[in-house]
Amino acid sequence: MRFVWFAMASLTLGAEWPEKAFPDWNDDTVRKVLTDSAWSRGKTVKLEWVKRDPGNINLRDIPGALHAPANANQSLGPLGGIGRGKKETLPSKADILIRWPGALPLRQATALYRIREEKLDPNKLNELIGAPEKYAVVELFGVPAEIAHQGTSVIESIVLRSATVQFGNAKPIRPVKVEAKLQALTMNVRILFDRTPEFSAKSADVEVYADLQIFSVREKFRLSQMQYRGRSEL
């Protein structure tokens, strides 16, 4: 299933910002920050439903895989919700987002999105933006829930062992914690890293890697484009 954000016009935000400053971003700018910016990348991943130990994964072994909840949404927005309907085969690919949800621009865009989508009180904007997180967070957003057929704790353990971020040619940094949360038929995986001095860098690239066994991701982000209001935002 292709998510709605991949149909939007391609415009990477980061090095170049819209004329209007926050909080006067329009809906298009909000969605671009959340889904196609210096802090967020869309990626199509191939799903290999073969265990690395002998045997294949059977669709009937996955709780809830054959029948979706009756009240599931038909489209996936940049903050949540999934498709619905009877699933007859395991998906062969998935469209996911790899992003830095703790970066201030994403927190601001998320707050604006929620206020407009959920009809919340605009006076709660600063409350919704919140304070910076203790950890630097990389999020894998929109992962098919079937991957967690053995439970989210298994996914957390697998990602904790495999994930890294690497700044330039420096030694890869491993996460201190992983949080996997199911949302109907999708799952969001948050990978938490200590904020070592490398996270304040302003040059080079940072490469994100994670292996979930059914698929793996490797994505580079350019630190020079991740500057916002005079500082690195990760």
Residue locations for each model-derived region?
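Sec-dependent N-terminal signal peptides
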Residues: 2-12
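PEST-like low-complexity, intrinsically disordered acidic/proline/serine-rich tracts
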Residues: 15-234
